[in-house]
Design a protein with these regions (language model features):
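Short, low-complexity N-terminal leaders and the immediately following helix N-cap/first helix
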Residues: 1-10
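Eukaryotic beta-rich interaction modules
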Residues: 6, 21-24
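AAA+ P-loop ATPase mechanoenzymes
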Residues: 27-31, 36-223
Length: 224
């Protein structure tokens, strides 16, 4: 990470970015941090977490805000209206990660390939909560600045053609998972080379309860 750090006010994410691990900030602030669209940033409230950065919506420019969804807010231990610090992340390719259901009473079975396909391009830290999906959005975001991302996403058309979740049970894309372990033990990005292991039983999370319904969920219902 660089030494440059900025402080921004947390506001809710829009539906297009919900549960995809994406944060939006002013492009001028991105330049200050030395990051481009698709790079990783550390967001820290009472806990540090990591997200992929995109530029702010035009109406948000100059407002000093960061748009993150309920999962990222939980991961950063920050609420809407809180101030968080934001800095450039030093992110490595994940060699191996272990995930487990984050909600008690849930058991999940699935194969490594299907799980990995649902997390491609995602940046995570140990203890983060994640949701499967959002792969195409992440690839589009990262490819615009960085070119083809085959080393991360592989043949994404094949993945998306089959939805990538063939080895998982129905409704799994709505399940929240906790990242129980990462190798190396630092901020990482999940790629097609990452080994993803599933602990089928829910793990105890010592921090606050995982949100079952977030502001973005409610916003989505209102839009329907």
């Amino acid at each position: 990470m660089t030494d440059k750090e900025i402080h921004l006010k947390v506001v809710e994410a829009q539906q297009d970015d919900a549960y995809k691990g994406i944060a939006r900030i002013d492009s001028e602030l991105m330049r200050e941090l030395g990051v481009r669209r698709g790079d990783a940033i550390i967001i820290k409230g009472n806990r540090p977490t990591i997200a992929i950065v995109d530029r702010a919506y035009p109406a948000d420019v100059g407002e000093g805000i960061i748009r993150i969804d309920g999962i990222l807010r939980r991961n950063a231990k920050a609420g809407i209206g809180d101030s968080v610090s934001v800095s450039k992340a030093d992110v490595k390719e994940a060699k191996k990660i272990t995930i487990a259901p984050a909600q008690k009473g849930i058991m999940v079975q699935g194969d490594e390939r299907s799980l990995r396909n649902g997390l491609l391009g995602r940046t995570v830290m140990k203890g983060d909560i994640v949701v499967l999906g959002g792969v195409q959005r992440r690839k589009d975001l990262m490819s615009e600045e960085m070119g083809e991302m085959d080393d991360i996403f592989g043949n994404i058309n094949d993945i998306l053609g089959g939805m990538g979740f063939g080895g998982l049970g129905g409704g799994v894309t709505q399940i929240k998972f906790v990242v129980a372990n990462v190798n190396p033990n630092q901020p990482v990005r999940i790629t097609e080379n990452t080994q993803v292991t599933l602990n089928p039983k829910a793990v105890e999370i010592s921090e606050e309860k995982v949100p079952e319904i977030t502001y973005e969920d409610i916003g989505g219902l209102e839009e329907e």
